Each structure stands twice: as C-alpha cells, then as structure tokens.
Amino acid sequence: MLLTASIILLSCNNSIYPTNGETIYRTGKNLRGEKLLDKKASRIKIVNNCKTCHGKQGDAMKNVSIKFSDLSNPNNGSVAYTDSLFYRFLDHDLKSDGSKANIGVIWKMNDRDKKDLLEYLKKL
C-alpha cells in the first residue's frame, strides 16, 4: 500500500525526471530535492534552473547553446569546453578561455550533481 502511494505521488510530481542531470537542468534541484542555485551569490535572482534561459533543448538563446556538442566544438569561435572547463565554469563563473562569464548565476553543486548535469547536456 505504501509503495503504491509513493509511486502515485512520484508519477504526479512533474518536477522529477528520469535522471539527476535532467532534473537539475529542468528544475534547478537535484533528485534529493536540494535547490542548487546560490541566490545570495547570483546577480540574477529570477532564474531557478538552466531551462529558463537555455530552453528545453539547450539552444533557446542565440549564441548561448549549452548543448555540449556546441560547447566542445573547436569551430565555434572560442576555446572548446572540456569536462574540466565546464566544471570550472560552474564553480567559478569562468568561460572556457578563462575570462569571467558575468552571467550572474551561481550554482552550488557537489561533484556528482555536476557530473550528472554534464552527462545530460552531452545527450541534448
């Protein structure tokens, strides 16, 4: 009975997605329900997740695609992102060339959450 109730509740909750990475991208929370946006450190306060600016498929904003296939493409006019450069971006708001991103959105993610988000972006 308890298992059935849990399954029903989870299936009704539209903020849970198949993977932790997709959940982070679409909701700004991990599967543990932790909010990952550091609103105190962020200049932009109205954003709660990646999808808000980047859209459902990661490419809603012109020249700001976060599909990893675009980020890691050396022909995009900037230094291609590697996994470690992407993690540095999340941790320090630095673009792939080392300059300040100045996006104003700061995330608090543990290593597992960062890896899961990157794996999701690689599938977009």
Region locations from a protein language model:
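C-type cytochrome heme c attachment motif
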Residues: 23-30, 44-56, 85-91, 115-119
